[in-house]
Amino acid sequence: MVWALGLMSGTSLDGVDAALIETDGVRIGRIGPSLTVPYSPELRGRTRELLDRAAGLAPDDAEVLAVTRELTLRHVDAVRLLREKAPGLEPAVIGFHGQTILHQPERGRSWQIGDARLLQDLCGVPVVHDFRSRDLENGGEGAPLVPVFHAALLHQEVRPVAVLNIGGVANVTVLGQQEPNGQRGVWACDTGPGNALLDDWALQHTGQPCDFGGALAASGAVHQDVLERLLAIPYFARPMPKSLDRLSFHPEAMACVRDLSAADGAATLASFTVEAVAGTTFPVRPEGWFVAGGGRHNPVLMDGLNHRLGNVASVDVLGWDGDALEAQCFGLLAMRFLRGLPSSWPGTTGVRQPCIAGRAV
């Protein structure tokens, strides 16, 4: 096994997560340290503006190029700081996801900005990037890619279980009952909104980047009629696998809640996230749910999930770092690329056949 360094900047647009894991691409050995380099308010704002306009932008747009460079330099900072934090754990490879500004699987397109060559040149470590393109080219959704990592972490768990990641978008990995030969089914999809709608609502009404501790949602009431309109969006009737962009049905959802008070809107949007998960049909019924991502810190979401699903806990009870999982995942995916191992399957992304993810610089 070798040390791999994974980098992830998610749809919450809060910064760059960097993490070290020891892996051969199949097994996970030691879990190294991790850290987050936050985006400045200015960089977050510029990135959000690109995200809002991405469908009409060209890769050589001046602002795209400028933000790409700034984001890449934040990733360089993250690598430098993590190497300083763990001087004896030198990475053999970096898995670089980049910042998603557009995800349109129905058009075969997913756009992550970031300069992999600049990152490799400044860090002096081989970089693997562009993890979604090949899956899309082979009929897949290009997301989610984390199931192979969840399966590796839970290789000793024999029950059917689910790992729910609540970032800007919520995605779930469902692992079937483990057979005596060690084989098990793996399925995945984006269930619906995670924190993105709540974050945008909180920013609009309180000036804060998120609903800290779920306080705003906890003080409000769910408007059932509005919730029913939100859940009638056609995406929720589609079978898995399926995936979303951060702004999928964003205007429609915000229009539904615009006349509500700040507290009631937050409560209704939180319930939207919960009900989208609870309403997703899986091939097997999970006996346990483990929640990762920023959403696990929101008591309103966690209480709602426990009420609807039962047996829901934070991944922290497993000893995992729920804020570093996706960064750790891209360390594993980079090693799988180097070994020629697939990272997506028909049950996880809808790809036609098992597919290797990534590309070397």
Swiss-Prot record:
The keyword Nucleotidyltransferase does not apply. GO terms for molecular function: ATP binding; kinase activity; phosphotransferase activity, alcohol group as acceptor. One of its GO terms (biological process) is 1,6-anhydro-N-acetyl-beta-muramic acid catabolic process. Pathway: Amino-sugar metabolism; 1,6-anhydro-N-acetylmuramate degradation; Cell wall biogenesis; peptidoglycan recycling. Pfam families: AnmK. It catalyses: 1,6-anhydro-N-acetyl-beta-muramate + ATP + H2O = N-acetyl-D-muramate 6-phosphate + ADP + H(+). Belongs to the anhydro-N-acetylmuramic acid kinase family. PANTHER family: ANHYDRO-N-ACETYLMURAMIC ACID KINASE. This is Anhydro-N-acetylmuramic acid kinase. It comes from Gluconobacter oxydans (strain 621H) (Gluconobacter suboxydans). The lineage of its organism: Bacteria, Pseudomonadati, Pseudomonadota, Alphaproteobacteria, Acetobacterales.
